Each structure stands twice: as structure tokens, then as C-alpha cells.
Regions:
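ATP-binding N-lobe of GHMP and related small-molecule kinases
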Residues: 1-103, 117-129
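Short alpha-helix boundary/capping segments
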Residues: 66-69, 106-107, 204-207
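Catalytic-loop motifs flanking and including active-site residues across diverse enzymes
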Residues: 70, 107, 111-112, 211, ...
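Gly/Ser-rich oxyanion-binding loop with an adjacent helix/lid
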Residues: 83-173
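ATP-dependent small-molecule kinase catalytic core of the GHMP/sugar-kinase superfamily
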Residues: 131-268
Length: 268
């Protein structure tokens, strides 16, 4: 018997000041706050159906039946929502994205934001934007930023209660366009979850985190004043800092490809 069904649409977000490393891996509490912009043209549409006739959760992603870690991660997140609602009905999840998954475009952020909203609706619950952001964070840290609209700041907090994202400016405040160059659409060899774990092994991570608050204040101010020169400088600096941490982690992570460097030089 179908218990209920609902659909939600979410968007990935591109971080200006990035999230990298946790103080609590289970709760996905970040070591530093972050600021991002939601990408309106990229979408993830997810339908969740709780169906008591199912033997277990079923997850279809872009028409492909999922198993292993992908299914397990989705089921674990649904268990949080089922636990809040107080039932254990299996679910069928249908999710489709119009952009590459696992290629550095925050696909997990959009996926878990959409999954959270759809599952909460399907379970017949109502939640505030703050609580949806908190809950989405448990599935993927960056998903907290895909709940509020427009330009978003993730407040790092120190517990599950106070780590969530808020909108600092609506989309129409500053109609920026993010130009995305996909140099490879294959899945990253090292996922972000593993990257967050390895961040603490880099001797550069503590310095990156220590200066994050200053960069966040400058970034927030740049958005409010629509100062593109300042914003672009901050974005490049913060990106380089993150990749420096990745390069110096143990084992090292290299997300840049030869084509990446060619594009970086061309833009300069």
C-alpha cells in the first residue's frame, strides 16, 4: 500500500568561501562557515514514495537502480526522517539531475536538499527553512546551503541545533551568472566526504580555517555592495587555499586536471 508521495526540486550551489573539513563527521559540523550562490539552471528533481509493500528502500538515480554505498547513504538519511516521524515504511526514491553527478558541481548538495524536502513532505511533516537546512546537512554538509534561496551563508555552529544556512541576499539582489566548464564528467576519484576526513592531515588546514572568518566577512560585504572585483579575488584565494589543503593531505588529493590549469591560465 502506498503510504504517500511527494516531489521536490533543488539546485546545487557554488561556494565562494568553501566548506572543507569537519569538527564532527557524524553530524557534518564544519570547521568553518561558508558562503555560496544557488545555481538556478541546474536542477535535481526527487520523488519519494513511502510504500509498505516494498521489502526495502529502492533508489533510482537518472534511470539507474542504485546499490551499495549510494543506496546506503540515502537510506541512512531517510532513517533520520522516518525516526522523527515515528515509522519505518520503506521508500522508493526517483531522482534526476540535468548536470553531471560527482564531477565537482555539488550534486550531493542538490540531491540531499531535494531528498530532505520531498521526504519531509511525504511523511506529512512541516518544517521551517532552518530545520530543513539542519536536516539536509546531515546527508551532505553543503546541502544545508541548497535549502535557502539566492546567496547563502552556512553558520557553522557547534552542535546539531545551531549549524544551518541562511539567505543573505535574494537571487534578484545581484544577477550573477556562473559559467561552468566541465573538463571531465566522470565521478571524482576522491569524494568530498573522504576529502573532509583527510583535511585534518594537512599542515595547512589550521591556517585556512583560522582565516576563514575574515574571508567570510569580506565576501558577505562584497555581495551586499555588489563588488565583483573583491568577490572574484576572494573566490580565487579561497579556492586555492582549499586545493592547497587537498594537495598536502595524507594521502594527497589532486582534483585539478591538466585541462583545469589550461583554463585557469586562459581566464587570467
Amino acid at each position: 500500500m502506498i503510504f504517500s508521495t511527494a516531489t521536490a526540486v533543488s539546485h546545487p550551489n557554488i561556494a565562494f568561501i568553501k566548506y572543507w573539513g569537519n569538527t564532527d563527521d557524524a553530524l557534518r559540523l564544519p570547521q568553518n562557515g561558508s558562503i555560496s550562490m544557488n545555481l538556478a539552471e541546474l536542477t535535481t528533481r526527487t520523488m519519494v514514495t513511502f510504500d509498505s509493500s516494498l521489502p526495502r528502500d529502492i533508489f533510482d538515480l537518472n534511470g539507474v537502480r542504485q546499490s551499495g554505498p549510494s543506496l546506503e547513504r540515502v537510506s541512512q538519511h531517510l532513517n533520520l526522517i522516518r525516526g522523527i516521524r515515528g515509522f519505518s515504511v520503506p521508500a522508493h526514491i526517483l531522482s534526476e539531475s540535468n548536470f553531471p553527478v560527482g564531477a565537482g558541481l555539488a550534486s550531493s548538495a542538490a540531491a540531499f536538499a531535494a531528498l530532505t524536502v520531498a521526504a519531509v513532505r511525504t511523511a506529512g511533516m512541516e518544517m521551517s527553512e532552518k530545520d530543513l537546512s539542519r536536516l539536509a546537512r546531515r546527508g551532505s554538509g553543503s546541502a544545508a546551503r541548497s535549502i535557502p534561496p539566492g546567496y547563502v551563508e552556512w553558520l557553522p555552529g557547534s552542535s546539531d541545533i545551531d549549524s544551518y544556512a541562511v539567505s543573505i541576499a535574494p537571487p534578484e539582489h545581484w544577477p550573477l551568472t556562473d559559467c561552468i566548464a566541465i573538463v571531465e564528467d566522470a565521478h571524482k576519484k576522491t569524494g568530498s566526504s573522504e576529502g573532509h576526513l583527510l583535511a585534518r592531515t594537512s599542515p595547512l588546514q589550521s591556517a585556512r580555517v583560522a582565516d576563514a572568518g575574515r574571508r567570510i566577512d569580506l565576501c558577505r560585504n562584497a555581495i551586499q555592495k555588489k563588488d565583483f572585483d573583491l568577490l572574484s579575488q576572494l573566490i580565487e584565494l579561497d579556492s586555492n587555499l582549499l586545493h592547497a589543503v587537498a594537495f598536502t593531505s595524507n594521502p594527497p588529493i589532486t582534483y585539478w586536471l591538466p585541462q583545469t590549469l589550461v583554463l585557469m591560465q586562459a581566464v587570467k
